[in-house]
Amino acid sequence: MKKKINLTQFQTLMLSIWHFMIHLKQRLAEDQINIRAGHLAYVSLLSLVPMVAVTMSMLSAFPVFQGIRGQIEDFIYNNFIPSAGDSVQVYINEFVDNASKGTAVGIAALMVVAIMLISSIDKSLNSIWHTKEKRSMVISFSMYWMVLTLGPVLMGASLVATSYVVSLKVFNGSDLSGVVPLLVERLPMLFSVATFLLIYMVVPNTKVKFFHALLGAIVAALMFEFGKKGFALYLTKFPTYEAIYGALATIPILFLWVYLSWMIVLLGAVITAAMPEYLDKKQSAVEDKNGEKEVVSQVPDVSFSISELPQEQSQEQSQEPSLKPVEESIKESRVK
């Protein structure tokens, strides 16, 4: 009996997943995330150097973060850019060094471009959630500025805290000696999940449930890891861009990877936004079905037995012969 129940539950779960995939396919067709990802990739390439320059300048403002710039760069380039992007790291570092030598007006322009990227991300994600209420200019600018200033600080603080925890003597013992490599190996994955979760919870101007955001964040993080490894494998096994573009191959490679990254981010956002819609639709379908059952149960019973008809006919037939003698007696009396 338990096996049958478990099999039924498994079939119900798979059917629900299939229906959700159909709903997700319709949602992806409506949102057109490929077009949005292209727009965000273009804005990201324009804002990449300003964002990195502002991030490094914010970290350099705090003495505690002065010695970890190299660690942050290595962490970002090794875990969020495919292994074939070593030349990308060199070029970006040169661009950032050149940007940091600019005047105050140039630095302000870089910050404006960086804020434009955050604004584009905000608008794209809110359009996926179909939010009708928009934030005011003051609130939007305050949020963008907070992300631009506090984001690098929080990232640096998390790396410092992780380095401190890993260096504790507790993890250096013989019993826990294998925990440190495992923790360091899983750190980029956990950081990706936390980043996607924060984006899906904070950026939309509507209420998002934690479980829905966590599901979208996990899917996006897994796809990001697989996409990074697959993209690196493609670049190493099939060096098409290097054969065509030569020394300029870094530009299309970087653009393609940024485009794929935004596709993954928007896909996780669509999953998070489509989950409550699917559950509400499923709940309304169940309520409609229950309502139809109640209406059917309230219809009065107008059925009758067919066997009653012959009895009535037999009664009529039995009454007709009883009237014949009376009619004959009346006729005889009239004749007399």
Curated annotation (Swiss-Prot):
What Pfam family does this protein match (any one)?
Virul_fac_BrkB
Q: What is its main location?
A: membrane
Q: Where is the composition biased (Low complexity)?
A: 307-323
- Top-level taxon: Bacteria
The membrane topology noted for this protein in its Swiss-Prot or TrEMBL record is: Multi-pass membrane protein
Q: List the biased-composition ranges (Basic and acidic residues).
A: 325-336
Give the residue spans that cross the bilayer: 45-65, 102-122, 137-157, 179-199, 213-233, 251-271
Q: Which keywords, in A-to-Z order, does the entry hold?
A: Cell inner membrane, Cell membrane, Membrane, Transmembrane, Transmembrane helix
Q: Where in the cell is it found?
A: Cell inner membrane
InterPro entries per UniProt: UPF0761_bac, Virul_fac_BrkB
- Provide the residue span(s) of the region labelled Disordered: 307-336
Q: One GO cellular component from the entry?
A: plasma membrane
Q: Which family does it belong to?
A: Belongs to the UPF0761 family.
| Name by which UniProt lists this protein | UPF0761 membrane protein Swoo_4618
